[in-house]
Regions:
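Short, acidic loop-to-helix structural element flanking the phosphoryl-transfer center
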Residues: 22-53, 61-65
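Short catalytic/ligand-binding loop motif for oxyanion handling, primarily in non-cytosolic enzymes
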Residues: 13-16, 61-65, 92-94, 117-120, ...
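Substrate-recognition "cap/lid" segment bordering the active-site pocket of phosphatases
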Residues: 57-106
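Asp-based phosphoryl-transfer active-site loop
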Residues: 2-16
Length: 159
């Protein structure tokens, strides 16, 4: 069975790293106030029938709380046991393997806007999907794998 692991900031939540670096560490509620990208309902629908997980890095505990508020608003169908919040710079694949006692394999897909996370995920045996947005790193950079501009592109593959 395919499993979809999704990042939040810059992937499904509108996060502009250039404008946020000074703010998110100081502004309470910063992450809770972020908007969602178009077609977020695709992820929410997939969460009803598929294994959908959230793996998002946070700078601090306040950001963790804010992200949980955001998730309850925009992705209420994601089971709370399928939400993992880690610290910036941690290897998402290793965190998931440890938390869920699973081995990342070719049926485990990470949707992320940050190529470093995708390379680490693939090195552990999973598959990566690069999220291209105008607010985040809109280039493929060194990433040569699957890339999407719109969340609706996931609908048929994971249906």
């Amino acid at each position: 069975m395919k499993r979809l692991f999704i990042d939040l900031d810059g992937t499904v939540a509108k996060f502009n790293v250039r404008n946020a670096l000074e703010r998110f560490d100081k502004e309470k509620g910063f992450f809770a106030k972020l908007g969602a990208y178009a077609n977020i309902e695709v992820i929410n629908e997939l969460a009803k029938t598929n294994k959908v997980f959230v793996i998002s890095a946070s700078p601090n505990e306040q950001a963790d709380k804010d992200k949980l508020v955001w998730l309850s608003k925009f992705l209420p169908n994601v089971n709370s046991t399928n939400i993992t919040l880690c610290r910036l710079g941690e290897n998402k694949a290793k965190i998931i393997e440890s938390k869920y006692n699973i081995t990342i394999n070719e049926d485990c897909y990470l949707l992320d806007d940050f190529s470093k996370n995708l390379f680490e995920w693939c090195a552990c045996g999973g598959r990566g999907i690069k999220r291209l947005t105008s607010l985040a790193d809109n280039s493929r950079g060194l990433w040569k794998g699957w890339a999407i501009k719109n969340l609706i592109e996931l609908q048929d593959f994971f249906a």
